[in-house]
Amino acid sequence: MSAQKPGLHPRNRHHSRYDLATLCQVNPELRQFLTLTPAGEQSVDFANPLAVKALNKALLAHFYAVANWDIPDGFLCPPVPGRADHIHHLADLLAEASGTIPANASILDIGVGANCIYPLIGVHEYGWRFTGSETSSQALSSAQAIISANPGLNRAIRLRRQKESGAIFNGIIHKNEQYDATLCNPPFHDSAAAARAGSERKRRNLGLNKDDALNFGGQQQELWCEGGEVTFIKKMIEESKGFAKQMMWFTSLVSRGENLPPLYRALTDVGAVKVVKKEMAQGQKQSRFIAWTFMNDEQRRRFVNRQR
């Protein structure tokens, strides 16, 4: 019997241990990065960023029909099971208005990244349509290359450059647009120094030297912003009030539970009608996202049925 990964959403495709033989058939370059654990089990060299990228290529091709995926060196290489979990929990949140998961939901991904991971999973699993925003032109080019290299994605995913410094929704959500939800994996650290220190800790934990790259990687805009995660999400909350009738649910990952109280206070200040916290777990890692809406139950039901 395959061992189960604790805590993953019931619809997550990654409950069992990776079938490395199958994944190596899907992406033969993964084979060179296989290693043995102290218990003698075959695994992937997760300390090697090229190994993690090869694993992601195989997972996305095998489970999500993304035959062509790549990212430039130095950009964030996200864990696929964890990102899939976020998508499935978001689907549950969207289902509460009508009792079923909407098949043609429109989702806004704030900071789509060079990897385009959330749209790739959401399109395959639920047939959703995505708009991805990004401040980095290099990340945007990478995401567009992924979309263009996989037939059908151009019809489901569109990208927009955020040109307004410090803005999140302003300049991205157009006047007459409506979205079922937004999702975001905000920058965690509050300075470049803090981001470097975090990378150093991970290097030490993995037994790497300073010259070794990290699969956690990430560019400046992916890892840190002035004031860190709390300040970024507070800015989201502040701007969200101006789009209260165009967005059913605003959501964001929150990396640390202790960051929740100031965010709850900010949500009270802007008059959020309902606030939800979704807890998630991937192995030993605990995470959560918060969601808020300015619509009551009846307004959300009408919103979901607007063009169905």
From Swiss-Prot:
Keywords of this entry: Cytoplasm, Methyltransferase, rRNA processing, S-adenosyl-L-methionine, Transferase
GO molecular function per UniProt: 23S rRNA (adenine(1618)-N(6))-methyltransferase activity
InterPro entries: METTL16/RlmF, rRNA_lsu_MeTfrase_F, SAM-dependent_MTases_sf
The enzyme's E.C. designation: 2.1.1.181
BP terms from Gene Ontology: rRNA base methylation
Record's keyword annotation contains S-adenosyl-L-methionine: yes
Enzyme class: transferase
Location of the protein in the cell: Cytoplasm
Homology family: Belongs to the methyltransferase superfamily. METTL16/RlmF family.
Protein name stated in the entry: Ribosomal RNA large subunit methyltransferase F
